[in-house]
UniProtKB/Swiss-Prot annotation:
Catalytic reaction equation(s): gamma-L-glutamyl-L-cysteine + glycine + ATP = glutathione + ADP + phosphate + H(+)
Enzyme class: ligase
Taxonomic lineage of the native organism: Bacteria, Pseudomonadati, Pseudomonadota, Gammaproteobacteria, Enterobacterales
Alphabetical UniProt keywords: ATP-binding, Glutathione biosynthesis, Ligase, Magnesium, Manganese, Metal-binding, Nucleotide-binding
Presence of the UniProt keyword Calcium in the record: no
Gene: gshB
Keyword S-adenosyl-L-methionine: no
Name of the protein in its database record: Glutathione synthetase
Organism: Shigella flexneri
Family: Belongs to the prokaryotic GSH synthase family.
Cofactor: Mg(2+); Mn(2+)
Positions that bind ATP: 151-207
Amino acid sequence: MIKLGIVMDPIANINIKKDSSFAMLLEAQRRGYELHYMEMGDLYLINGEARAHTRTLNVKQNYEEWFSFVGEQDLPLADLDVILMRKDPPFDTEFIYATYILERAEEKGTLIVNKPQSLRDCNEKLFTAWFSDLTPETLVTRNKAQLKAFWEKHSDIILKPLDGMGGASIFRVKEGDPNLGVIAETLTEHGTCYCMAQNYLPAIKDGDKRVLVVDGEPVPYCLARIPQGGETRGNLAAGGRGEPRPLTESDWKIARQIGPTLKEKGLIFVGLDIIGDRLTEINVTSPTCIREIEAEFPVSITGMLMDAIEARLQQQ
């Protein structure tokens, strides 16, 4: 029997209709895995050994009562076959410390999804720089004068922090906007923090597409998140409307170009953000949108994921 651990935000607070981690747990349980639930505070290191307080978990598709704990134990993380690291951002120092603990278990043979080193290496905004032929024009800087020059060149730009999620602190600055200076000061914290600028992509009106990639293989359907009511942001957390769709030819091209690098880096479950035919982000920490896509199309993304995990476990 495969022992699967998951590190996530409190399961009591999730919306099971939309929660991808919950979808993963349902599929793992359907396959007879033993589920071990952990929150960040349950992980610890003792004399170099990664351990955790885990609670054995049952889940069910019930909106009133979707989980129950059936046991608890303190164990070495190496006792688990696989651990899903599904803690939502912020990607802060606490998150980084947790990846070091998980890495100690990985060294003892536990499969960590996604690979701890790659979680640290692949910032969701900056990692797109390795695929610059696929992205919009992109500037990463702390320098207000550089941001101003970029804006003057493109006249309509998007500014965002490197550590945001859910569309937080994303600004559109159009030609003639008097607020560029204060936005630049806010995002760079007066020149002490990097931010990202990209030329505005009018294709956002048709949606910001979330394309999921499982161990290098693109899922054939995506979720387009369409901005509502004059918004620039399509993020569901910012009020965007989700519309599942088949991948376009350019979606396939982008996902297939990036897929081998993701697989090589142990990034087994990844969400690409694509606007039109441009890659804007590579989400590696806790990608979502499984449930919305599975509800609309005949595809089991969680099945693809568990198949990939089982294949990797057999290779070890």
